[in-house]
Amino acid sequence: MQKPLGVILAGGLATRMGGGDKGLLSLGGQSLLSRVIDRLAPQVAGLALNANGDAARFAGLGLPVVADTIEGFAGPLAGVLAGLDWAAEQGAEAIVTAAADTPFFPTDLVARLTAAAEGQAHPLVLATTPKSGDEVLKSGGKGRVNRHPTFGLWPVALRDDLRAAIEGGLRKVVLWTDQHGGREALFEAEPFDPFFNVNTPEDLARAEALLR
């Protein structure tokens, strides 16, 4: 399998941060997006940013910006589809996605996702972390892992199927990945979950503390 392209998902609405682009928030003197770029770029063959609206606000990042091709903020799957369409134009086989508000994801993300896809006709893998004891209890014992649907390996070959699913109203990532035999790559969640994302001002303060 050739080295995948990377797509950073920044197309959502940051309602819990008062709107605007979460990825442009500063964390330790560097934007969240810049931190995500620094982590993902060494792992992939090339990078693009999925974002909607005026692309000029991201001009300083030096990345191609690809907007959702499905209107109405259809969620992460629309961003994945936009990334797959871009990757198809580059002649790539697959992409790895990462969220723009998750600055601590693993530096071996891509290697472990691609390893988990070995033998798959169409590589499709989501990142997971173990649930804590409290989380298992709250879920009634259903499932022992948390799946992180914005962190995955996605095959260009299934983009038309994904487009049809989104146009048909599908929004939940794991429903689509399960339909296509998606696998999981398990990452440790100690000393903290590396897929911790910044959704609120309190989360941003916690991220600042983790940098120290």
Predicted regions and their residues:
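Nucleotide and nucleotide-moiety/phosphate-recognizing core
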Residues: 1-173, 178-194, 201-202, 209-212
